[in-house]
Amino acid sequence: MEKLTILLVGSGGREHALAWKIAQSPLCGRLVAAPGNPGIEAVAELRAVKATDADGLVALAQEIGADLVVVGPESALEVGLADKLAAVGIPCFGGSQRAAQLETSKAFTKDFCQRHGLPTAAYGVFEDAASAGAFLDTLEAPFVIKADGLAAGKGVVIAPDRAAADAAVVDMLGGRFGSAGARVVIEEFMHGEEASLFAVCDGKTAVLFGAAQDHKRAYDGDEGPNTGGMGTYSPPPVLTDALIDQAWRELIVPTVEGMAAEGNPYVGVLYAGLMLTPTGPKLVEYNARFGDPECQTLMLRLDSDIVPILLAAAKGELANAEPPKWREEAAICVVLAAEGYPDAPKTGGRIQGADADFGDDVVVFHAGTTREFEGRLVASGGRVLNVCALGATLSEAREAAYGALETISLEGGFYRTDIGWRALQQR
């Protein structure tokens, strides 16, 4: 096979992990990332085109003669990048605007689940506080309140009592998340443990692509506000083969078939956020891309070339593709965040030690970083670095990641010291 020119869209830790893995492929001749970050720059050419500039990205893909475009963030799918690439005949690993509604509209997904009988929490969708209140009357605390649209992982409130639930509804409908909160989805609270399951899809076929468990709260002990994710590990012991099989049969397969039947064939990553309830896995939410930071641990564990499977998915040829192979080891990712994250992260803090050689089993991915004058590395976002490690056991991987973190400094930065606690406790 001839070497490919690949365009990677995005600039976070997830995209650095994808770039790192794509660059290892013998099929990758040229890798261009837009807009990228200083970590990605080590393995790819960077172009200053934003992930939400669909027309600019199509022009860039045409200019470089891209054989494949790999989309990292959901924001690029929401503006129809995959549709615009399809119109000019460029294969894209990422969903159409309509298919991406599985992530970009929680109401769309809940209604889809209802139409196809998929296991999920009872719910209602509301545009005014009065009707939302009437539905809350029928539920018991705690209450789950979600903004309908994209809110960077922060649009979900678990309200312990009715007063907090009413306040969350008023807050969202009042414009806290802009148009994303113009509708709210209210759900019954599901009891159980959460885990994430990943599938790569080509519109008609789905291939299992690993599992992970993440930590959404900002601080140790699962305290503090929700974030985009403070750390993750893979594989999660709680997600047994039997549970994966059940989720595959009851959620993934009917979703891919249902989307195709409704004229919205799903291409790209289908990321199922699962609640492992006493009666089996139920859907919390779908995401239309690799999780961040879940992707980072999957890339460390992936023991086969990623490019053929991405290309096969983009071209509708997954049925003939080699399934991915996985390393036996456990992987962990710990997020180093800027002071004030998630509410008001302070940017500009100086980063030191991130470029050290930590050995083969530790990889540091850049998330929110930029280079100032004289090449100095500083924080440019809320989640700054992802320190990832492999180990024969989760304990070993954890030791390696935290050992590396001790030698990395970020002014005012913080990280959780308990990533992986659930799995270690279960042992």
UniProtKB/Swiss-Prot annotation:
Q: Where's the ATP-grasp domain?
A: 110-315
Indicate which residues the UniProt annotation says bind Mg(2+). Answer: E285, N287
Gene3D superfamilies, A to Z = 3.40.50.20, ATP-grasp fold, A domain, ATP-grasp fold, B domain, Phosphoribosylglycinamide synthetase, C-terminal domain
Q: Which reaction does it catalyse?
A: 5-phospho-beta-D-ribosylamine + glycine + ATP = N(1)-(5-phospho-beta-D-ribosyl)glycinamide + ADP + phosphate + H(+)
The prosthetic group or cofactor this protein requires is:
Mg(2+); Mn(2+)
User: Cofactor: bound how, per the entry note?
Assistant: Binds 1 Mg(2+) or Mn(2+) ion per subunit.
The Gene Ontology biological process terms listed for this entry are: 'de novo' IMP biosynthetic process; purine nucleobase biosynthetic process
Family annotation (InterPro entries): ATP-grasp (IPR011761), ATP_grasp_subdomain_1 (IPR013815), PreATP-grasp_dom_sf (IPR016185), PRibGlycinamid_synth_ATP-grasp (IPR020561), PRibGlycinamide_synth (IPR000115), PRibGlycinamide_synth_C-dom (IPR020560), PRibGlycinamide_synth_C_sf (IPR037123), PRibGlycinamide_synth_CS (IPR020559)
* GO terms for MF: ATP binding; metal ion binding; phosphoribosylamine-glycine ligase activity
Keyword Ribonucleoprotein found: no
Listed A to Z, the keywords are: ATP-binding, Ligase, Magnesium, Manganese, Metal-binding, Nucleotide-binding, Purine biosynthesis
| Membrane-spanning ranges | none
- For this protein, what is the EC number? 6.3.4.13
| The protein's annotated pathway | Purine metabolism; IMP biosynthesis via de novo pathway; N(1)-(5-phospho-D-ribosyl)glycinamide from 5-phospho-alpha-D-ribose 1-diphosphate: step 2/2
EC supergroup of this enzyme: ligase
Positions that bind ATP: 136-196
UniProt-listed PANTHER family: PHOSPHORIBOSYLAMINE--GLYCINE LIGASE, PHOSPHORIBOSYLAMINE--GLYCINE LIGASE, CHLOROPLASTIC
In terms of NCBIfam families, this protein maps to:
purD (TIGR00877)
**What family does the entry list?**
Belongs to the GARS family.
Q: What is this protein called?
A: Phosphoribosylamine--glycine ligase
Protein species of origin: Caulobacter vibrioides (strain ATCC 19089 / CIP 103742 / CB 15)
- Gene designation per UniProt: purD
